[in-house]
């Protein structure tokens, strides 16, 4: 429920900024593995928010992309560790709620499909159900594409995004190239670059890889102009040098 507020707030900001007029439709682009954040946007639309398209952005664990392409959800695949770990998921538990909706609120059908996922690792929705997914677009970004987008956004806009946001930005570019749809779009930035400092800084310049994690925090602050979050400052304050061994203790 709290995530629904993100999209209502973003819409009101677009109206206030003059980007759109009240009642105009927008698209939303969400990096997701568990399907929770984008489901919140879907529920916001059900409550009246004018959303035209839901762009579901996946990383290399592209089980959701394949589902929207084919109508088959198949978790029987290699699990890939990526630089956007919050999306490293093969069982998108919140997708069940959307399945229930497109099944016509048929709890029995929904239960049948979820049982197939548990026992066989795969299920396929009906053609009628798949037709109800027309407002969704599935896309994915590779690790190389994600890193390239971080670098591109920094160099073109002097703005630093995290790996998950970069997945969404990459997929948005693919969506526009494929469809030509220029509807104003909200890209959900779901994490701080400070949470994935090494991946972000290495994408900007591989030479940063020689620095320690805490040195990278300082470098990120210099590049971004954004103050180090208090939670990280608190961790830094716990570091001390143990005298006689000179070990760093956290």
Regions found by a protein language model. Give the residues of each.
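Conserved active-site and cofactor/substrate-binding residues in soluble primary-metabolism enzymes
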Residues: 2-6, 35-39, 89-97, 141-148, ...
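Solvent-exposed, flexible loop/coil residues
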Residues: 39, 68-72, 127-129, 144-145, ...
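Active-site-adjacent helical/loop segments in soluble small-molecule enzymes
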Residues: 1-17, 22-25, 101-182
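Catalytic phosphate/nucleotide-handling subdomain of diverse soluble enzymes
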Residues: 49-65, 170-234
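Exposed alpha-helical structural elements
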Residues: 63, 97, 108-113, 145, ...
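Short beta-alpha connecting loops at secondary-structure transitions
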Residues: 77-86, 131-135, 237-238
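Single conserved hydrophobic/aromatic residue that forms the stacking wall/gate
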Residues: 239-250
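Glycine-rich phosphate/pyrophosphate-binding loop at beta-loop-alpha junctions
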Residues: 19-22, 27-117, 188-204
């Amino acid at each position: 429920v709290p995530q629904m507020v993100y999209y209502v707030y973003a819409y009101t900001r677009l109206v206030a900024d003059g980007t759109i007029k009240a009642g105009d439709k927008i698209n939303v682009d969400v990096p997701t593995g568990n399907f929770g954040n984008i489901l919140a946007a879907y529920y916001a639309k059900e409550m009246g928010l004018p959303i035209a398209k839901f762009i579901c952005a996946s990383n290399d664990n592209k089980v959701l992309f394949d589902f929207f392409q084919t109508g088959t959800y198949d978790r029987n695949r290699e699990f890939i560790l990526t630089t956007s770990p919050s999306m490293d998921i093969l069982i998108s538990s919140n997708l069940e709620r959307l399945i229930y909706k497109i099944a016509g609120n048929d709890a029995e059908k929904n239960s049948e499909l979820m049982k197939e996922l548990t026992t066989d690792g795969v299920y396929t929705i009906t053609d009628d159900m798949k037709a109800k997914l027309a407002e969704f677009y599935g896309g994915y970004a590779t690790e190389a594409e994600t890193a390239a987008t971080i670098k591109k956004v920094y160099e073109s806009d002097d703005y630093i995004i995290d790996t998950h946001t970069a997945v969404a930005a990459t997929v948005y570019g693919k969506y526009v190239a494929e469809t030509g749809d220029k509807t104003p779009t909200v890209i959900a930035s779901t994490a701080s670059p400070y949470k994935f400092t090494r991946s972000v800084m290495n994408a900007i310049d591989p030479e940063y890889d020689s620095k320690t994690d805490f040195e990278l925090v300082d470098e990120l602050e210099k590049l971004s102009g954004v103050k180090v979050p208090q939670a990280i400052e608190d961790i830094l304050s716990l570091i001390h040098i143990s005298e006689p061994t000179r070990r760093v203790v956290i």
